[in-house]
């Protein structure tokens, strides 16, 4: 019986101590003060680093104008900055792999939006309302055997 008293006293002492405080997980910030996020679209995956700067955007070690041939792609990638009114306030470095140009554009857009959301929580409502934080899960439907494409079938003849 004396052993049981000692154990219960230890437990009571632990319970009377300060309560445990759970640490909130840190946002993805590296040692250089950059916010990190990944974006996905179709088969493309983009890794995006965002830091306070002058508005430079580098994609796979090229400027955004060199990497994307069309100006419309550049405008859609800059959409999160237009919505949050932070054009020329952040520098972006991103690497993107897989997919085509359109999928890569969507992946970068998604990654930038997520990184901006981490940099300032005030932007969350704006980006969510603009539909930039949700991942576009549409992917190409697979081809079925016995058909020409995913939905296209050979011509049917009754007789």
Curated annotation (Swiss-Prot):
Spans through the membrane: none
GO biological process: translation
Species per Swiss-Prot/TrEMBL record: Rickettsia peacockii (strain Rustic)
Family to which the UniProt record says this protein belongs: Belongs to the universal ribosomal protein uS9 family.
Family matches, as PANTHER family: RIBOSOMAL PROTEIN S9, SMALL RIBOSOMAL SUBUNIT PROTEIN US9M
InterPro entries to which the protein is assigned, alphabetical: Ribosomal_Su5_D2-typ_SF, Ribosomal_uS9, Ribosomal_uS9_bac/plastid, Ribosomal_uS9_CS, Ribsml_uS5_D2-typ_fold_subgr
Cellular component terms (Gene Ontology): cytosolic small ribosomal subunit
Database matches in Pfam families: Ribosomal_S9
Gene3D superfamilies xref list: 3.30.230.10
An example molecular function term from Gene Ontology annotations: RNA binding
Name of this protein: Small ribosomal subunit protein uS9
Protein keywords: Ribonucleoprotein, Ribosomal protein
